[in-house]
Amino acid sequence: MQAPPSFYEGDTLEVAKKLLGQKLVHIVNGIKRSGIIVEVEAYKGPDDKAAHSYGGRRTDRTEVMFGAPGHAYVYLIYGMYHCFNVITAPVGTPQGVLIRALEPVDGIEEIKLARYNKTDITKAQYKNLTNGPGKLCRALGITLEERGVSLQSDTLHIELVREEEHISSQYKITAGPRINIDYAEEAVHYPWRFYYEGHPFVSKK
């Protein structure tokens, strides 16, 4: 079943950890593409210097961060790679969780085509399908068109995985510093990256 609106409410760090093991789903041209979330990063504006909303900075791009939890925040890095975030916290508190890596599940052939323009790929290429925020967006067809979309929609949502199928029993959740935020002064060291230790699709060990 889809995660209800209440799933995204509450402390952002706790929501980040709850997202691990759940399934991110995007329906593209009627075909389901999905992956199990194995790595996330929490961003807690306005006090977090790594957050786009640090200091309460409000722009056209970040406006969705100030809205209701349970919406998609998508942005570009380096002008070419999309990043997908889940908005958390109450209205007016601009916080969210970046989805950093997935284990692909549904629509594998479409995911391969999106990433490599072919379906016959090597084992190394398979491991690189969705092991990074830009890679997973390309694989699932997530673009700026999805910015601000409610995660209660039929085409973009988080699907809760049943307890008996959840991979949390197989992997330990580890916390550590977030990646590529050297500009963020003391926030560089916050242990707000959560991931399944040893999972092959985690972006950085």
Swiss-Prot record:
Pfam entry (one): Pur_DNA_glyco
One GO molecular function term of this record is: DNA binding
Keyword Hydrolase among record annotations: yes
Domain of life per record: Bacteria
Record carries keyword Hydrolase: yes
Q: Which GO terms describe its biological process?
A: base-excision repair
Q: Which CDD domains does the entry link to? A: AAG (cd00540)
Q: What class of enzyme is it?
A: hydrolase
Which spans of this chain does the record mark as coiled coil?
A: none
Q: Which UniProt keywords apply?
A: DNA damage, DNA repair, Hydrolase
Which PANTHER family does this one have? DNA-3-METHYLADENINE GLYCOSYLASE
User: What's the family?
Assistant: Belongs to the DNA glycosylase MPG family.
Q: What is this protein called?
A: Putative 3-methyladenine DNA glycosylase
Native source organism of the sequence: Bacillus thuringiensis subsp. konkukian (strain 97-27)
